[in-house]
Structure formats: C-alpha cells, structure tokens
C-alpha cells in the first residue's frame, strides 16, 4: 500500500526527531545505527568510535525499532500526534520526551530480545553502564550484554543437565587442566618430556576451537603415534571432566554449541528470544564462536558484527580472520558499512598506518582519515645499540615531562618481552616511574587458589581436583597415600571422591585416615548448610575459621605468612565488592564471575598512577596514549623471523604493526638499534621492512640525510658490518657454546627453519638446545604436532625447505 500524504509527513517528522537523538554521530556511524534488519558487518577502523555505534544501535533498536525508515504513520496516529511531534522537534521539552519517543517507535525490541557479545568483562560492563544512562537501569539490566563465556554460562546453567552434567558444575582454569593432564599421563605411563602437558592442553584446546570431539580428533590421527596418544588423553580428559562435573573455558562455548545443535527446543527458544544479535571484536572470533553466533541468530537473521580485519592479531589463540573476511558469504544479503573517520590520531599517524597495512593482500580494505591535520612527523631513531636506544627513549620522556607532560602520557611497545629489560634498567637509572602492563598475579597465588578451591568444593563436592588440593590444607593427617586409596575406592564404586571421604569408615583400606576424612566431609557439609542462610562474606569467614586456614598462617608468624594472610583478606574485599554490586549475590555467580576474570580486567584495577606503561603490542590492543614508542623496529625482531617465508604469518605481523601505530594519539616514535646483544651474540640488524613501508615524507629520521630515500634501501648503512638475522643468531649462540675436548657439535638447524621430515611431513624448528654433544630439536609439525628429536638422528630423515 502506498503511503498517504499524512504517512509521508508523519514519517518525515519522526525521522527528524530520531535524527536529533543521534545528531552527534557522523554519517557512517548513523547509517550503522539505523540499519537494524538483516545481517550487517560494521568494519570499524581503529579509533572510529565503534563502542559508541554499538551502544546507540542498541538504543535505537530498543527505543525506536524500525521507526527510522518506516514509511507509514502508526495506525492510531492523529493530526494532534503529528502536531505534538512537530512542536517537540521545534522545542524538545523534557516533560514531552516520553510521549515523543513512543510516537516514534515502530516495533521496538524489548530489552531482553537483544544480546550483545563482547570479549572482555570490561567491554561488557561499559556497554551495560552506558545503556543504563540512556534507557534506565531496569531496561538495561534485561539486555544480554555479556562476554562469550558469560552468555554461554547462562545458557548452560539452565540446560547442561541434558549432557549429563549437574547444573552446579565447576570451571577449571589452566592450572587445574594441567593437573588433570598430568594425572592422565601418569595413568598411561607417558613421559611428560615427550607429551609436555602444556603442548597437549594446546592441542586439545585447538580441537575444541574447531568443535572436534575426542572421537573426531581420533579419526584424524592417520595412525600417527603422537596424535593417537593425544586422542586417548583427550578422551580420558573429557571423561574425567564429566565425572568431576567440571568444564574448562573451551567447554563453555563448545558445550553450548552442542546443546543448541542437538536439542531443537533449546535452539528454538533462544532463536525466538533474541531478535537482535550483536558481536564486538568479530575479527577475534574462532570457529566455535562463529557457529555459536550463527545458531543464536538463526531465527530472525538480525545479526550485526563489529570488527576490523586489519586488527586481527590473535591467530595464536585460535582466532581466524576468515570469519570477518567471509561474512558476506556466510550470511546472505549482508550489508557492509565502513567506519573510517578516526577520532584518536593525527593525519600523519593515520597515513602511516594506512600505508603499512595497504601491503596486506587478505583484507577488506579501508582508509582511515581524520580532521586532525598537520600532526607531528613520525620520529624514526636508529641508535648504535640497545643501550643507546633505551637511553634515547628515556631522554625524550624526561624532556617532555620537563615541558609539562605527564609520565602517564607515554607508552613503550615491543614485539617481545625480551626487549623490555634494557629499557626498564634505563628508566630506573633515570628515575622514570613505569609499570609493566600485565595480568592476574593475584589470582595465581597459592593461598588465593586454596580459598577458591574451598568455595568451589562447597558449591560442587564432586570436584575431585579442588577437593584433593584442600583436603590436607592445612594439614589434617590425611596423607597422599590415603587420598590415592580413596580415589581407587571411588573409581571401583563409580562414585565421587567426596562420597568415599564422607563414609571413609566404611572402607577397611582407609581405616587409618577414616576419622580425619569424615571430619573433613562433615565440615564441607556444614559449609553447604551455612551457605543457605549466611551471606557470602560471612560464609567466607566461616571457611577461614573452621578450616583452620587462617590459624595456620597466623601460627607461622613470618613475613611470607603475613603477606599470604593479607592476600586472603584481600579476597574478602573482592567478595564484599561483588555483594555491593549485585542485588542477589550467590556463591555460584561469584565463582563464575571470578573464573571469567580476564587479564585486561585485572590490569584495569591498577591505580591510575603517573607512570609510563610498558607492554607488548598484543597487550596494547584497545588502548591509546598521547605518545607511543615502538622499540625494536628491526627485521627478525619485528616482523619476527618466524614469519619469514609465510605470507599468512607476515600479514599478521603487519596487522600487529598497524595496531601499534594506531595506539598513538599525538606523537609516534619508532626506534631501532644498529646492533643489539641477544642470546649472548651481537646482532647486526636490518631496519624493519614495516618502517620501510611508511612514506618518507611522513618521517623525521636520523637514519639518513637523504629525506627522499626509501627506508628499504637503508640496508647499505650496514655494509660495514656483517648482517646477521635473529634466526642465525640463535644458531650462532648455540654453536658457540664452550667446546669440550671431544669434537664440538655444530647444529645445521635453527629456530624458524622450515623443514620437511620423511615421516612427519612439513614443520618448523621452534627451539634448539645443546645436549650431550648433540642438539635437541623441538619441531612443530603441521600434521602431528610438536616433537622433540635429536639432531644427529633426525638429520637422516629431514631437510630444510
């Protein structure tokens, strides 16, 4: 039906009112906010205001629905309504706002019909807080603005019993997983030096990232011994996790996908529930997350993803850039909107970033621009050595601070932590306050893990791993042999370890420890009963008191014990803070929130002291600073020598450079050293090729007096010294070990070498270690995982590519 004249007039004034609400946005941001129906890819460049777009898009969906482009007036609209809207447009009085918003709404979404998924708790919290200010706390609290893991946990808590788990399941972290894997290796009589637990955990995690079950993994081993054994470890790991009623972080997403795929009623419920699905940082998603998102959006197909393919830098964590590059193929009739106006950096910095990233082939393509013109040129400084480089960085900071800058204006970025040591030393000598931007030391401390273990066991007594951690902490005269015997009894009876401990006197084999075990069991049951009527803080105090943990620390009365006691009490502060922020605080919810605490969230808790921040380029993603130093701009360091010869890896390194450059708001310094001491050797390096990709007119450099010279030609400056790559330096460092009286071994392989093995196929050497006149090679093979081989034996079946 053709719109009437009244429809056209009403739609025009409605659009004008809505435009006023979003008047502070630029044209492309507003287009993204207004596009509500169907698949949408928002390519958001660095500093382009993507969070603002996400927030306002949710506001538009909840307040106005399809009102922006709806060609008709509401069915019950009158001329008086039209006049009211027109008057409101001319004079928007606050008392008239509610009615005006109602008149502009067409099929608005209810808040609980919107889900916005992020990667960090910090980002999710920011979304919720800004929504609260815009639509009120009641409506904002109904929106599912969560991390992937938190959203999945909400689904699992309601549905995981369909997979044979109890809804009070436990979440295992990396340390817990390692303990389980080590126990399995012991049961299978496998050598940890060959089946290194961290490597095995990584292989299992990568399998879960692509939704491979143990059976799927086993079917693809091709008879290879190593992978076949890992398949058996994976099978046993999953069995033990289920018996312990526990999930690891990868399971949280994988099990959610499994439920949505296998149970039609659950899938239909969530597809009908979520009219609008939004995902932040889409370039960082893996395959499992892509499948999850596709399932949730399968009802209405109103999926909006926000991301930047040029900032995809987490391949090592399982992220695949394919998800964002092929969005239009995966979701039919998708629309793509590019946010290219940058509000962070100067034009010079953006032009440099554009020039570098333009060299990548696998990208969607966009050009960042800004209205902040005539910025400072990029400073490229080549020092004689790493000491002079560190001294230069310190001097620049000191000079700017004397001129009125704050230490907190500065950040020093580097590709690898190995570069921070020298800079730290010079900062200390110069009295420059600094902090290494890092993760969650507090939650890794033994005493904190002990207290969390108590809380988890109260929540889930079937958690054998945490139970074994605390059953004799503090000492209760329950020895390792008794615990092992109890485990055997539990396995024979097909019950949990806790059930055996509760009734230990029923087992003759446990007679010596039975009384102590049953006392422990009664204590845990008491805590469970108290959890029904005590608040979390009071329950924590009860556990500290009745477990004897606090007394054990106080009795030692040494500095270490006092420090540990302080940490234990600091955890109580976390509990109190959690209680203050949540209307209905529960033990299960608190444990979930703490388990999902991320590195970024932990570092956010640091005070905002006036100090220079130092961090890896990966850690810098999402941050911004007035002045940024990128140290170690040398081929072999950055890009890493490991990316040489591999286009996919080199493009990821270039994206990392793009991220580093775009952290700077006002000034960018790129520093390098003509020679650098590494691995006990002096390395003569080439200037990073990424520096060579920046147009010369954007750079103020001390490298050459010829301003038009391309930086890729600066190799000539090094001809007076032999140019040695970092990979070659590894080899040199290894082969220059002190010689024994027997003939010294010389290794033909170095880290970074691409090789072919007659049995194991293609691979890359990741480390070389001298060992008994030979060298132990660690090689990451594409098909069989990482293997350790002795060089003399391997050489007969292996060659460089």
Which residues fall in each region the model found?
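Helicase P-loop NTPase motor core
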Residues: 48-54, 69, 74, 89-107, ...
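P-loop NTPase Walker
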Residues: 1-167, 171, 268, 322, ...
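Conserved helicase/translocase P-loop NTPase motor core
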Residues: 24, 71, 81, 88-100, ...
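ATP-hydrolysis module of ASCE/P-loop NTPase motor domains
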Residues: 36, 119, 139-143, 160-251, ...
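Hydrophobic residues in beta-strands of the RecA-like P-loop NTPase core, especially within AAA+ ATPase
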Residues: 278-285, 306-307, 630
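C-terminal accessory regions
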Residues: 615, 632-786, 793-801
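Conserved RecA-like helicase ATPase core segment
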Residues: 2-24, 59-70, 76, 83-104, ...
């Amino acid at each position: 039906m053709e719109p009437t004249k009244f429809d056209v007039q009403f739609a025009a004034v409605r659009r004008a009112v809505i435009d006023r609400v979003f008047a502070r946005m630029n044209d492309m941001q507003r287009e993204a906010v207004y596009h509500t129906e169907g698949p949408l890819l928002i390519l958001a460049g660095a500093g382009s205001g993507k969070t603002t777009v996400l927030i306002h898009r949710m506001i538009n969906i909840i307040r106005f629905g399809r009102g922006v482009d709806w060609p008709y007036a509401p069915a019950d609209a009158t001329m008086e309504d039209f006049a009211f809207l027109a008057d409101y447009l001319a004079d928007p009085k606050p008392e008239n706002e509610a009615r005006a918003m109602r008149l502009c709404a067409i099929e608005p979404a209810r808040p609980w019909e919107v889900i916005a998924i992020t990667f960090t708790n910090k980002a999710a919290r920011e979304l919720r807080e800004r929504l609260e200010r815009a639509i009120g706390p009641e409506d904002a609290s109904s929106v599912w603005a969560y991390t992937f893991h938190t959203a999945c946990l909400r689904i699992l808590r309601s549905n995981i019993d369909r997979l044979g788990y109890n809804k009070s399941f436990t979440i295992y972290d990396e340390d817990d997983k390692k303990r389980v894997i080590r126990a399995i290796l012991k049961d299978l009589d496998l050598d940890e030096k060959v089946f290194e637990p961290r490597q095995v955990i990584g292989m299992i995690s990568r399998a879960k990232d692509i939704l491979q079950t143990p059976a799927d993994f086993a079917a693809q081993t091709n008879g290879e011994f190593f992978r076949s054994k890992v398949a058996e470890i994976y099978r046993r790991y999953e069995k033990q996790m289920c018996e312990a009623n526990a999930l690891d972080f990868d399971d949280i997403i994988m099990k959610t996908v499994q439920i949505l795929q296998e149970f039609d009623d659950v899938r239909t419920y969530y597809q009908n529930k979520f009219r609008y699905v939004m995902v932040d940082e889409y370039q960082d998603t893996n395959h499992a997350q892509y499948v999850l998102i596709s399932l949730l959006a399968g009802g209405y197909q109103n999926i909006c993803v926000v991301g930047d393919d040029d900032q995809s830098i987490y391949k090592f964590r399982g992220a695949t850039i394919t998800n964002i590059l092929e969005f239009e193929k995966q979701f039919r009739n998708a629309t793509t909107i590019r946010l290219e106006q940058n509000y962070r950096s100067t034009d010079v910095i953006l032009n440099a970033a554009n020039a570098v990233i333009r060299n990548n082939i696998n990208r969607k393509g966009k050009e960042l621009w800004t209205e902040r013109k005539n910025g400072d040129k990029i400073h490229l400084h080549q020092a004689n050595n790493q000491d002079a480089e560190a001294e230069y960085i310190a001097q620049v900071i000191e000079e700017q601070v004397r001129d009125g800058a704050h230490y907190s204006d500065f950040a020093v970025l580097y590709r690898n932590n190995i570069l921070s040591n020298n800079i730290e030393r010079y900062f200390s000598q110069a009295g420059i306050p600094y902090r290494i931007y890092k993760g969650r030391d507090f939650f890794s401390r033994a005493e904190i893990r002990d207290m969390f273990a108590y809380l988890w066991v109260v929540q889930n007594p079937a958690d054998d791993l945490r139970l074994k951690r605390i059953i004799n902490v503090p000492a209760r005269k329950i020895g390792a042999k008794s615990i092992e015997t109890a485990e055997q009894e539990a396995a024979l009876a097909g019950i949990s370890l806790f059930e055996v401990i509760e009734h230990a006197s029923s087992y003759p084999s446990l007679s010596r420890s039975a009384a102590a075990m049953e006392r422990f069991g009664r204590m845990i049951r008491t805590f469970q009963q108290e959890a029904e009527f005590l608040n979390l803080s009071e329950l924590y105090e009860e556990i500290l008191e009745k477990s004897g943990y606090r007394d054990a620390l106080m009795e030692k009365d040494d500095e270490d014990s006092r420090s540990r006691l302080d940490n234990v009490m600091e955890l109580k502060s976390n509990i109190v803070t959690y209680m203050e922020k949540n209307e209905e605080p529960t033990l299960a919810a608190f444990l979930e929130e703490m388990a999902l605490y991320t590195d970024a969230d932990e570092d956010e808790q640091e005070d905002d002291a006036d100090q220079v921040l130092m961090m890896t380029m990966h850690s810098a993603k999402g941050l911004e600073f007035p002045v940024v130093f990128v140290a170690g701009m040398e081929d072999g360091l950055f890009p890493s020598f490991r990316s040489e010869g591999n286009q996919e890896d080199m493009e990821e390194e270039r994206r990392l450079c793009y991220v580093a450059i775009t952290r700077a708001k006002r000034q960018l310094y790129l520093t390098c050293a003509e020679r650098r001491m590494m691995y006990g050797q002096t390395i003569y390096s080439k200037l990073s090729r990424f520096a060579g990709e920046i147009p010369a007119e954007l750079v103020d450099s001390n490298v050459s007096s010829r301003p038009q010279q391309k930086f890729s030609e600066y190799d000539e400056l090094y001809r007076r010294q032999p140019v040695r790559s970092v990979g070659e330096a590894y080899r040199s460092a290894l082969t220059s070990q002190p010689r024994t009286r027997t003939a010294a071994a010389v290794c033909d392989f170095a880290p970074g070498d691409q090789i072919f093995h007659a049995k194991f196929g293609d691979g890359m050497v990741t480390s070389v270690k001298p060992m008994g006149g030979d060298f132990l090679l660690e090689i990451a093979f594409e098909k069989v995982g990482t293997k350790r081989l002795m060089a003399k034996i391997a050489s007969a079946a292996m060659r460089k590519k």
